[in-house]
Design a protein with these regions (language model features):
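Surface-exposed interaction/gating patches
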Residues: 176-198
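Histidine (H) residue identity feature
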Residues: 3-4, 81, 158
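A glycine-anchored, Pro-Gly-centered beta-turn/N-cap motif
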Residues: 72-74, 78-86, 174, 181-186
């Protein structure tokens, strides 16, 4: 099985989640945006058009099944949570963004999607989004995004049913530790309707080599009091992670499908 990868930390590798996890830090978004702006600027000055897929090891099939699904904020492993294929992506209402991390094929994409005419970096519709099996797709909180494909490889979907069955509630002011107070694993994080941050303090084994000795890595998922912004899907919570919530109670609901359970790959630099 392919390993999930952390979109935020990939920013530091020349891509730009500078993570869910992020979960993905705001500075990551800025760094990633700046990276791609520089790439596009360099290409335009040389008269060339930047090709995000120039290092892909194979071509995606142009035949397959029709796929039409709405995805909200969260992490989606291609081949597990969404089939491989060539997609058109459109915001239903409002604006959002996607991060695509595909180390196998050298594909790193960050794109804002919405209908703000004053935002030159925002696409109303994103065509030709190529999702290869094993890549990690992150959909940011905001508008729900419609993913459509005429060549989705639905018959190749894999992964296993999540063995976890019980939900976990975390109250404001409470600290809970994965592996002690609840099982580590892959969860959908649901917040009560309020402005809220879920703070995830990762164990020492996930420290950056550049971090000071006393620092521990904290990932943040932010929620807004809007229906579409109250859930983040498929969040890996490794053993030893401390969970706190700042503005409202959250519920950790086991994700339906899981891929790899080696979350070191997800949070790696």
């Amino acid at each position: 099985d392919s390993q999930p990868r952390d979109a935020v930390q990939k920013i530091g590798k020349g891509l730009a989640i500078g993570s869910v996890i992020l979960l993905v830090a705001a500075v990551g978004a800025v760094a990633l945006n700046s990276y791609f702006e520089e790439q596009e600027k360099g290409q335009s000055q040389s008269g060339e058009e930047y090709d995000e897929y120039q290092f892909a090891k194979r071509q995606l099939s142009e035949t397959g099944e029709a796929y039409d699904e709405v995805l909200t904020g969260g992490y989606y492993e291609v081949g597990v949570h969404i089939p491989e294929g060539i997609y058109t992506v459109e915001a239903q209402d409002g604006e959002s963004a996607i991060y695509l991390i595909d180390d196998e094929n050298g594909i790193y994409i960050w794109q804002q999607i919405g209908n703000d005419p004053e935002n030159p970096n925002q696409a109303a519709v994103m065509d030709d989004l190529r999702l290869y099996d094993g890549a990690l797709l992150e959909v940011k909180s905001g508008a729900a995004l419609q993913f459509r494909s005429d060549c989705a490889q639905t018959e190749r979907l894999h992964g296993e049913t999540n063995p976890l069955q019980d939900s976990v509630r975390v109250e404001v002011g409470q600290t809970m530790t994965a592996g002690r107070d609840f099982p580590e694993g892959l969860y959908n994080v649901k917040s009560e309707p309020d402005w809220n941050d879920l703070m995830m303090t990762l164990p020492d084994s996930f420290l950056s080599e550049f971090a000071a000795d006393e620092e521990r890595r904290v990932e943040v998922i932010s929620f807004a009091p809007k229906e579409l912004d109250l859930s983040y899907e498929n969040v890996p919570i490794p053993k030893g992670t401390e969970i706190q919530t700042t503005g409202a109670a959250v519920t950790l609901e086991p994700s339906e499908k899981i891929g790899s359970t080696d979350y070191g790959e997800f949070y790696k630099e």
